Swiss-Prot record:
Gene that produces this protein: purT
SUPFAM superfamilies: Glutathione synthetase ATP-binding domain-like, PreATP-grasp domain, Rudiment single hybrid motif
Pathway annotation: Purine metabolism; IMP biosynthesis via de novo pathway; N(2)-formyl-N(1)-(5-phospho-D-ribosyl)glycinamide from N(1)-(5-phospho-D-ribosyl)glycinamide (formate route): step 1/1
Record: residues binding N(1)-(5-phospho-beta-D-ribosyl)glycinamide: E26, L27, E86, D295, K375, R382, R383
The organism of origin for this protein: Pyrococcus furiosus (strain ATCC 43587 / DSM 3638 / JCM 8422 / Vc1)
InterPro entries listed in its UniProt record: ATP-grasp (IPR011761), ATP-grasp_carboxylate-amine (IPR003135), ATP_grasp_subdomain_1 (IPR013815), PreATP-grasp_dom_sf (IPR016185), PurT (IPR005862), PurT/PurK_preATP-grasp (IPR054350), PurT_C (IPR048740), Rudment_hybrid_motif (IPR011054)
Residues noted as binding Mg(2+) in the record, renumbered to the chain: E276, E288
Entry protein name: Formate-dependent phosphoribosylglycinamide formyltransferase
Binding of ATP, residues: R118, K159, E199, E200, H201, I202, E207
Length: 429
């Protein structure tokens, strides 16, 4: 790890700076594209061939990232300057071993270890960062789950202790939902479900993500820069639409920066963190943290200047390149270019070789564009693309993104065409 960098080499030569992506989805693809623009060599790893980031990397490897020996074989061969986890399903022991051997793990192995485990994260938020969260309890048996839900109160949320994207989570309205919540955690979690966290339901106005980025300043000191908070909503626990700026009060915005600063200072390291929070009026509660670019932050592909999306900011922090900002009331802020919004394009069916139509109409809409991720396989709920829209009025950007997304139809080799307008919950149009 260096401090502020003044030089870069050339990819595929002996002067190259090299990054290794552990996970090669749509977020990794955008990191790889930003790296390519700076002549940085990119190596992408995932469990399946032709994952999105692999399509724009210099080299790729397919294997089980829970297998420590596989990860070591790649690292020893490539000797990257930075190892960038993009997903949760990675052997954590390997990350600590890489650091011990002198490799730079982004942001650091400990932050990744904490963030992917809800109990470790919640205890870190409450006891070390000392930031407000919803009330919570843990359960390891069905009887304990009944007891915890009664004490927290209904409605409440149950979540597998290790998972992501809403998998293994359930909104519990009353005791009759608890058996289903237990089954959901035990069968749908993307990681361990040996324990379940029960969280108080916060009746929030908006859910936001703060994309706080820790990086070196011109004096070689680590500072934190804050883009405008990103508003978003989820459907069935998974991101469906986002927009920037979030429509919150000035007081709440300052509290968002304060909470994000306390959390990222505790986690440490370099890079961008997606800090999820609930906002109601002027009150803010911390929820979860992603130690990497965040799904909802794809809106910055439209709202931020070229090269400074959340992916560009993450890469600059990793490489030790400068990030502009302005100090306002004690916080270093990154300026937006224009209000913008996203809306997902999701599969409703399973199958291979997805095809999309409706593009002639969708791509004719002014102030909007589409990103198709290039995933070779579809299944219900899988995110295959996103619409970006921008406008001086963020409400208009939100409507435009939604409208364009619903123009797209999708099919696979084994299914018929289906439109995106099958989902209407929380929509504006």
């Amino acid at each position: 790890m260096i401090k502020l960098r003044d030089e870069l080499g050339t990819a595929t030569t002996d002067s190259a700076q090299k990054i290794l992506l552990l996970g090669s989805g749509e977020l990794g693809k955008e990191i790889a594209i930003e790296a390519q623009r700076l002549g940085v060599e990119v190596v992408a790893v995932d469990r399946y061939a032709n994952a999105p980031a692999m399509q724009v990397a210099h080299r790729s490897y397919v294997g089980n990232m829970m297998d420590k020996d596989f990860l070591w074989s790649v690292v020893e061969r490539e000797k990257p300057d930075a190892i960038i986890p993009e997903i949760e399903a990675i052997n954590l022991d390997a990350l600590f071993e890489f650091e011990k051997e002198g490799y730079f793990v982004v942001p650091n192995a400990k932050a990744t270890w904490i963030a992917m485990h809800r109990e470790r994260l919640r205890e870190t938020l409450v006891k070390e960062a000392k930031v407000p969260t919803s009330r919570y309890m843990y359960a390891t048996t069905l009887d304990e789950l009944y007891e915890a839900c009664e004490k927290i109160g209904y409605p409440c949320h149950t979540k597998a202790i290790m998972s992501s994207s809403g998998k293994g989570s359930y909104f519990v309205r009353g005791p009759e939902d608890i058996p289903k919540a237990w089954e959901e955690a035990k069968t749908k979690a993307r990681g361990s479900a040996e324990k379940i966290i029960v969280e108080e339901h916060i009746d929030f106005d908006v859910e936001i993500t703060e994309l706080a980025v820790r990086h070196f300043d011109e004096n070689g000191e680590i500072v934190t820069t804050f883009p405008k908070p990103v508003g978003h909503y989820q459907i069935d626990g998974d991101y469906h639409a986002s927009w920037q700026p979030a429509e919150i009060s000035e007081k709440a915005e300052r509290e968002v920066y304060r909470i994000a600063k306390r959390i990222t200072d505790v986690l440490g390291g370099l890079g961008l963190f997606g800090v999820e929070m609930f906002v109601k009026g002027d009150k803010v509660w911390a929820n979860e943290v992603s130690p990497r670019p965040h799904d909802t932050g794809m809106v910055t592909l439209a709202s931020h200047p070229p090269g400074f999306s959340e992916f560009g900011l993450h890469l600059r922090a990793v490489l030790g390149l400068p990030i502009p900002g302005e100090w306002v009331d004690g916080y270093r802020l990154f300026p937006m270019l224009i209000p913008a919004a996203t809306h997902v394009i999701k599969a409703k069916v399973s199958g291979y070789s997805p095809r999309f139509r409706g593009l002639a109409k969708a791509l004719s809409v002014p102030n909007a564009t589409i990103r198709l991720f290039g995933k070779p396989e579809a299944y219900p709920g899988r995110r295959l693309g996103v619409v970006l829209a921008w406008d001086k009025d963020v409400q208009e950007a939100k409507k435009r993104a939604e409208m364009v997304a619903h123009m797209i139809e999708l099919r696979t080799r084994s299914s018929d065409w289906h439109s995106q307008d099958y989902e209407k919950r929380k929509h504006l149009l």
